[in-house]
Amino acid sequence: MGADENKVPNKIQSIRQNKIKNDVQNAIQIQSFLKNIKSKYILKQIFDNIEKDKVFKLINYNKSIQNRLEIGLDDYKNKFLNVIKIEIIPKINCGKDKFINYIINENKYHIFFDEETNERKTNSFSLTNRASKVKITLYFEESSLKGLFKDCECIEKINFIRFKRKDIIDMSYMFYGCTSLKEVNLSNLITDNVKDMSFMFYKCQSLTELNLSKFNTKELINMKSIFSRCSALEKIDLSNLDTRNVEDMSYMFYECYYLNDVNLSKLIVKKLKNVSYMFYGCYSIQELNLANFDLNSALIEKKLVFSGCSSLKVFKVKGYYRGDVKDMFKGCSDDLIFNLEYPKEI
């Protein structure tokens, strides 16, 4: 063990006793102490005994420590470098005091870091009277982004610049109530282990188009109300989604009034239990291809699935549908209902 490492126990004890005050000078002193320590294990011991907010401060103020953590502590970096970099364009003169809130667990520590102003906020970040473009770095520990932008009515555009997390399991309510959101770039999102996307885009009523084709959804279970009340949504690409483990698609496109371009023909559903109200009120849809959906299964809840799809003319499903057509297709054209009740033999 080197001479510098012999000092470690005493330094750790000092850290415990003093609890590292919230000033930059202390952070700089600790950085100076850490410079010459090469041992991954010793570094880990030190960081384990520093309060999390101080670790974030160290990382922010010293790129060399950040680099050493990233390169040298592969198992440990996930704890402190769970970074998401986001570019946000707020609505001009929104007039509402709205915050980005990381609400999953109030007992955990989260930092929003404004790269333009060096402003740091814990647990929430105000967008009130912000500039035309805001770049934010979010540090967090949980494997969840539930409700991250919930009710942020002032955001018009979101771009995920950097997204290194692979262990996120919950993205439910992520953009819930973002009524001004017009554009969101999801290409960098890693969704490999996400199980819950329910209400993810609920009431994003300014979105006209969404591309989820790059999402890896092999673990996804819950899609309830994911696009519900996206009343301006016209086109959505779900062509590459893996839905083999999805159990709930109820209210999925509920009241997506202008949706007219959605291709579900490649979706494979094996564990589906609920599709009730899935397309309720989608009065612009003219064609639906659900070739892999077995709507005859008694195990699937399917109340009013296509109710109000008044423009629906072409409907494809696995086999002939033998259920209560008038309930599932309430409000659809008489011709469509007749053809479903009395299918022509091929």
Model-found features: residue ranges?
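N-terminal capping/linker segments that flank leucine-rich repeat
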Residues: 1-168, 292-297, 313-346
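Serine/threonine-rich, low-complexity intrinsically disordered segments
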Residues: 17, 192-193, 210, 219, ...
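Short loop/beta submotifs within extracellular cysteine-rich repeat domains
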Residues: 131-133, 152-158, 180-184, 206-210, ...
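Canonical leucine-rich repeat
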Residues: 134, 145, 158, 171, ...
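Core hydrophobic positions of leucine-rich repeats
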Residues: 144-152, 169-179, 195-204, 221-232, ...
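Position-specific detector for the leucine-rich repeat
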Residues: 153-154, 164, 179-180, 190, ...
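Conserved, compact domain cores that house catalytic/ligand-binding motifs in diverse enzymes
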Residues: 158-171, 175-188
